[in-house]
Structures are given as structure tokens and as C-alpha cells.
Amino acid sequence: MKVSLFVTCLIDLFYTEVGKATVELLERLGCKVDFPEAQTCCGQPAYNSGYVKEAKEAMKQMMRAFADADYVVTPSGSCAAMLKEYPHIFHGDPEWEAEAKRLAAKTYELTQFLVDVLKVEDVGASLHGRATYHTSCHMTRLLGVKDAPLRLLEHVKGLELVPLPNAHQCCGFGGTFSVKMGPISEQMVDEKIGHIEEAEADYLIGADCGCLLNIGGRIARLGKPIRVMHIAEVLNARN
């Protein structure tokens, strides 16, 4: 099965190990992974900030880059959700609406692809410790991916998965929200970390690097002994 990787900006710039883990995991499960080098930002930051014209140019480049892909897989619920919004954004555009629909139809978040397309729940991973899972707002509310990550994590050998209190509560990142509304964002992430501590977790696992950047950065600043991991790293682990 041929899979085209959409790596996302945050992974490309800050979390390259997540991209590598994603490729290794997919290849181990029998996929042939390629990386269209013409890909760019999905356009979400610009679009959400009101720069619609500029965002659309990035979106058009994404549609060109992945035109020949069979499946587009990304280790980001937020960016996958944005690609799924392209048909709405380009509705009525005679040149781009059809392309937007094609890209949206073949785009999957990583755990969604593993469970719904490959029909795999046990990927043979092992990681010893106590973990809790944070689901991002976009992944849950826009993309609708809720159970797939948990079903995969439940099969990780040696991992004790415990519920996160108020799991669906925002971590306070929200893209530019964390910049424009810094004091509020800080209170939100502090509350999230408090819930992680309630779970007495060794690991905080998530599927969106924006959330992990926000939560992990605050954990580091506070000096908390909690390791933050992307779910791709966990599913590719052999500890």
C-alpha cells in the first residue's frame, strides 16, 4: 500500500523524531511511504488569523503536491482536520473545488489510518510505565477521531493506560490563542498539568505536536518529572 506522508510544520521544525517514527511504523506494517517534497503548510495558521488569500495559496500548493497520492497520512489531528476543511473553503471554486474534495477524501490522521484502513490495533509496540492520553480539540471535535488512539495504546505491551481527568478540556494552545491570550493560556495549561499529575502518569501521550509543545514546554519550565511523547513514538517503541 502506497502512503504519502504529510509531515506538518511543527514536526518538520521541532519534532523530526515523530516524522521518523511515523515512517518506520508505517513501513513495518507493510506500507510503502513516500514524501512529496513540494508539500508546505496546510494553511491553518494564516486562515485562522484572517489571512484567507494567503492561506489559499498554501492550500493550492498542498493539493498540487499530493495530487498523485493514494493515501495522505499525517501524525497530526489538527492538520488532518484542516485538509478535511478544504472542500468547504473552496466551495464554488470551479478550478479547485474538485481537487479539494479529492485531497480531503484520501487524508487520514495516523491512528485513524492504522485502525480504519489497515485494520490494525496491535502494532507490536512495548513501553513500560504508567501513561495517560491527551486528545486535541481539533482531533476530537473537528476530525471526530476519539477511540482509535486509545485502542492502539491499550495494546502496547508494558504500558499501563490510565484515564486523564477532564481529558477533552483544551490545553490552552489553540495556535495563536496561546500568543494573543497568554495569561489565559497559561492558566489552562497549568490546569491540564494538574490533571496529568492527578493521574500519576510517567508519560503524557498526545497526537498533536501543538499540544505537546505547549504542555511539554510548561512541564519543563515547572520542572515536573513527566515525559511527553507523541503517539507515533509510543507505537514505534520497543522498550
Swiss-Prot record:
It holds the Pfam family CCG. InterPro entries: Cys_rich_dom (IPR004017), LutA (IPR022822). GO terms for cellular component: cytosol. One of its GO terms (molecular function) is oxidoreductase activity. It comes from the Bacteria. GO terms for biological process: lactate metabolic process. Is involved in L-lactate degradation and allows cells to grow with lactate as the sole carbon source. Belongs to the LutA/YkgE family. This is Lactate utilization protein A.
